[in-house]
Amino acid sequence: MKIIDAHHHTWDLSVFPYSWMNDPHPTGDISHLKNNYLIDDLLEDAKNLELIKSVHIQCRGGINSPVEETKWLQSLSDKQGFPHGLVVYSNFLRADIEKEIEEHCQFKNTRGIRYLLNYINNDPINSFAPKEVLINNTFKKNYSLLEKYNLSFDMHLWWTQYNYAFDLIKSYPNILNIINHAGTPQKRDEEYLSNWRNGLKTLAQASNTVL
């Protein structure tokens, strides 16, 4: 069976700093990730599968020049054939972001943008965003630019934010949204899972959303 890996990461610690590797993480100890993971590693892990294409999701984040990562990933693709699509990073809380989006789009494999949305008030470990950005006017203005550049948006968020996300998604029906990591469920108790399931059902009402 032919497979497209729709969400993977590649990093080279000799090329970029990855500050998130040193931050407290909701999943606990991630020290085992502090090794390079390159295209050859991806292909080795998939050697028993018919992997025909892949989509790389940004993994530097929180940096001043995110286009550098896009340029690097495009060079990997040009040399090794993977990845085929790039979901890149831009800080959607910046007012002057359009020029950076244009720079990302100079690289032929650019397909979308991800800005981590996860936020829980007074819970810094579980908050990747500095505030609830889904209701922020600067964020909404930048999000609207995706239609102009024919880019998708990867949504990484908690179920408590699904209603905000749904309102945004419905306001821009021509922007495709990809819900990351099955909507990032955190707990296994039935009340939590029920809220998560019901939230996904709400998001599923929008035809411009995929999981």
What is each residue range found by the language model?
Residues 64-79, 165-178:
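Short, electropositive alpha-helical surface patch
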Residues 1-74:
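An N-terminally biased module of ancient metal coordination in phosphate/nucleic-acid-related enzymes
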Residues 8-10, 57-59, 87-92, 114-117, ...:
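A cross-domain feature marking catalytic cores of carbohydrate-active enzymes
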Residues 39-44, 70-74, 97-102, 139-143, ...:
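Generic structural signal for well-ordered alpha-helices
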Residues 60-61, 115-134:
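Glycine-rich phosphate-binding "P-loop"
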Residues 33, 60-67, 90-97, 157-163, ...:
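Acidic-and-aromatic substrate-binding clefts and catalytic sites of carbohydrate-active enzymes
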Residues 2-5, 52-55, 83-87, 110-114, ...:
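Structural preference for beta-strand elements that scaffold enzyme active sites
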Residues 129-211:
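Catalytic pocket-lining loop regions of alpha/beta-barrel enzymes
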